[in-house]
Protein backbone atom coordinates (compact mmCIF):
# COMPACT_ATOMS: atom_id res chain seq x y z
CA UNK A 1 0.00 0.00 0.00
CA UNK A 2 2.82 2.39 0.92
CA UNK A 3 4.52 1.77 -2.44
CA UNK A 4 1.34 2.68 -4.31
CA UNK A 5 0.93 5.86 -2.28
CA UNK A 6 4.61 6.75 -2.76
CA UNK A 7 4.26 6.23 -6.51
CA UNK A 8 1.28 8.57 -6.57
CA UNK A 9 -1.13 5.89 -7.75
CA UNK A 10 -4.86 6.54 -7.28
CA UNK A 11 -5.47 3.92 -4.58
CA UNK A 12 -8.79 5.41 -3.40
CA UNK A 13 -10.32 5.12 -6.87
CA UNK A 14 -12.61 2.20 -7.71
CA UNK A 15 -10.77 1.31 -10.94
CA UNK A 16 -7.83 -0.56 -9.42
CA UNK A 17 -4.09 -0.26 -9.05
CA UNK A 18 -1.41 -2.94 -9.07
CA UNK A 19 1.86 -3.05 -7.13
CA UNK A 20 4.47 -5.71 -7.90
CA UNK A 21 6.87 -5.79 -4.96
CA UNK A 22 9.98 -7.82 -5.79
CA UNK A 23 11.37 -8.41 -2.33
CA UNK A 24 14.40 -10.37 -1.20
CA UNK A 25 12.56 -13.63 -0.56
CA UNK A 26 9.25 -13.28 -2.34
CA UNK A 27 7.35 -11.22 -4.86
CA UNK A 28 3.94 -9.85 -3.90
CA UNK A 29 1.52 -8.83 -6.61
CA UNK A 30 -1.17 -6.69 -5.00
CA UNK A 31 -4.38 -5.27 -6.46
CA UNK A 32 -5.64 -2.18 -4.63
CA UNK A 33 -9.07 -0.62 -5.07
CA UNK A 34 -11.13 1.84 -3.01
CA UNK A 35 -8.27 2.30 -0.56
CA UNK A 36 -7.95 -1.38 0.35
CA UNK A 37 -6.34 -4.58 -0.86
CA UNK A 38 -8.61 -6.30 -3.37
CA UNK A 39 -6.38 -9.32 -4.12
CA UNK A 40 -2.84 -10.54 -3.58
CA UNK A 41 -0.68 -13.23 -5.14
CA UNK A 42 2.64 -14.16 -3.55
CA UNK A 43 5.34 -15.80 -5.65
CA UNK A 44 8.02 -17.53 -3.60
CA UNK A 45 10.97 -16.02 -5.39
CA UNK A 46 12.80 -12.75 -5.06
CA UNK A 47 16.10 -10.99 -5.38
CA UNK A 48 17.95 -13.40 -3.07
CA UNK A 49 17.05 -16.29 -5.37
CA UNK A 50 18.57 -14.43 -8.32
CA UNK A 51 21.74 -13.74 -6.30
CA UNK A 52 22.04 -17.43 -5.40
CA UNK A 53 21.56 -18.40 -9.05
CA UNK A 54 24.37 -16.02 -10.07
CA UNK A 55 26.67 -17.68 -7.49
CA UNK A 56 25.71 -21.08 -8.93
CA UNK A 57 26.26 -20.03 -12.57
CA UNK A 58 29.66 -18.47 -11.81
CA UNK A 59 30.74 -21.70 -10.09
CA UNK A 60 29.55 -23.76 -13.08
CA UNK A 61 31.03 -21.50 -15.74
CA UNK A 62 34.32 -20.43 -14.14
CA UNK A 63 34.90 -23.00 -11.38
CA UNK A 64 35.03 -20.08 -8.94
CA UNK A 65 33.08 -19.49 -5.74
CA UNK A 66 31.95 -15.91 -5.19
CA UNK A 67 30.20 -14.36 -2.22
CA UNK A 68 26.51 -13.61 -2.22
CA UNK A 69 27.20 -9.88 -1.80
CA UNK A 70 29.43 -9.91 -4.90
CA UNK A 71 26.63 -11.63 -6.81
CA UNK A 72 24.11 -9.02 -5.67
CA UNK A 73 26.47 -6.17 -6.59
CA UNK A 74 27.05 -7.66 -10.04
CA UNK A 75 23.30 -8.10 -10.50
CA UNK A 76 22.63 -4.46 -9.73
CA UNK A 77 25.61 -3.14 -11.70
CA UNK A 78 25.31 -5.08 -14.96
CA UNK A 79 22.04 -6.97 -14.61
CA UNK A 80 19.26 -6.91 -17.12
CA UNK A 81 16.42 -9.18 -18.09
CA UNK A 82 17.23 -9.55 -21.78
CA UNK A 83 20.67 -9.06 -23.23
CA UNK A 84 21.70 -8.82 -26.85
CA UNK A 85 25.37 -9.71 -26.95
CA UNK A 86 26.48 -6.89 -29.25
CA UNK A 87 24.50 -3.98 -27.83
CA UNK A 88 23.86 -4.50 -24.16
CA UNK A 89 26.55 -6.69 -22.69
CA UNK A 90 28.10 -4.92 -19.71
CA UNK A 91 30.55 -6.58 -17.34
CA UNK A 92 32.08 -6.31 -13.89
CA UNK A 93 35.15 -8.01 -12.42
CA UNK A 94 34.80 -9.95 -9.19
CA UNK A 95 37.43 -11.75 -7.15
CA UNK A 96 36.37 -15.17 -5.96
CA UNK A 97 37.99 -18.37 -4.77
CA UNK A 98 39.13 -20.89 -7.36
CA UNK A 99 37.45 -24.20 -6.63
CA UNK A 100 40.44 -25.89 -8.23
CA UNK A 101 43.39 -24.17 -6.49
CA UNK A 102 41.70 -22.54 -3.47
CA UNK A 103 43.43 -19.29 -4.48
CA UNK A 104 41.94 -15.92 -5.38
CA UNK A 105 40.75 -15.76 -8.96
CA UNK A 106 39.33 -12.85 -10.94
CA UNK A 107 36.21 -13.53 -13.02
CA UNK A 108 34.13 -11.33 -15.27
CA UNK A 109 30.40 -11.41 -14.69
CA UNK A 110 28.54 -10.03 -17.66
CA UNK A 111 24.96 -9.07 -18.42
CA UNK A 112 24.40 -12.31 -20.32
CA UNK A 113 25.17 -14.39 -17.22
CA UNK A 114 22.89 -12.25 -15.07
CA UNK A 115 20.11 -12.46 -17.68
CA UNK A 116 20.45 -16.26 -17.59
CA UNK A 117 20.14 -16.15 -13.80
CA UNK A 118 17.12 -13.84 -13.88
CA UNK A 119 15.05 -15.64 -16.53
CA UNK A 120 13.70 -18.60 -14.50
CA UNK A 121 12.59 -16.24 -11.76
CA UNK A 122 11.10 -13.76 -14.22
CA UNK A 123 8.99 -16.57 -15.61
CA UNK A 124 7.69 -17.40 -12.12
CA UNK A 125 6.80 -13.74 -11.55
CA UNK A 126 5.04 -13.59 -14.92
CA UNK A 127 3.15 -16.78 -14.03
CA UNK A 128 2.03 -15.17 -10.75
CA UNK A 129 0.98 -12.07 -12.65
CA UNK A 130 -1.09 -14.18 -15.03
CA UNK A 131 -2.78 -15.95 -12.09
CA UNK A 132 -3.86 -12.70 -10.45
CA UNK A 133 -4.97 -11.17 -13.76
CA UNK A 134 -7.18 -14.21 -14.42
CA UNK A 135 -8.96 -13.54 -11.10
CA UNK A 136 -9.26 -9.80 -11.76
CA UNK A 137 -12.75 -8.46 -12.40
CA UNK A 138 -13.33 -6.67 -15.72
CA UNK A 139 -14.11 -3.46 -13.80
CA UNK A 140 -10.57 -3.33 -12.42
CA UNK A 141 -8.71 -4.38 -15.56
CA UNK A 142 -8.35 -0.93 -17.15
CA UNK A 143 -7.24 0.68 -13.90
CA UNK A 144 -4.63 -2.01 -13.32
CA UNK A 145 -3.44 -1.67 -16.91
CA UNK A 146 -3.00 2.09 -16.51
CA UNK A 147 -1.93 2.24 -12.85
CA UNK A 148 0.77 -0.30 -12.06
CA UNK A 149 4.20 -0.03 -10.48
CA UNK A 150 7.06 -2.43 -9.74
CA UNK A 151 9.07 -1.82 -6.57
CA UNK A 152 11.83 -3.51 -4.59
CA UNK A 153 15.57 -3.77 -5.15
CA UNK A 154 15.50 -6.15 -8.10
CA UNK A 155 12.85 -4.04 -9.85
CA UNK A 156 15.78 -1.75 -10.76
CA UNK A 157 17.22 -4.34 -13.16
CA UNK A 158 17.23 -2.99 -16.70
CA UNK A 159 14.32 -4.35 -18.69
CA UNK A 160 12.46 -5.95 -15.79
CA UNK A 161 9.59 -3.47 -15.74
CA UNK A 162 9.16 -3.69 -19.50
CA UNK A 163 9.06 -7.49 -19.29
CA UNK A 164 6.51 -7.44 -16.48
CA UNK A 165 4.28 -4.79 -18.01
CA UNK A 166 4.41 -6.38 -21.47
CA UNK A 167 2.49 -9.24 -19.83
CA UNK A 168 -0.40 -7.00 -18.78
Go through the PLM ranges and name each one.
Residues 11, 22-26, 34-36, 142, ...:
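Short flexible coil/turn linkers enriched for glycine and charged/polar residues
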Residues 21, 54, 129, 150:
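Residue-level signature of catalytic and energy-coupling elements of molecular machines
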Amino acid sequence: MAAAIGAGLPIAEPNGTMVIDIGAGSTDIVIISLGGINDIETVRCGGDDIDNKIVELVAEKYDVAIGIHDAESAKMEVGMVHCSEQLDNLSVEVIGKSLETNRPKKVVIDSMLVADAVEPFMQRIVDGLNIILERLSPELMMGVYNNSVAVGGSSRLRGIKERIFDEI
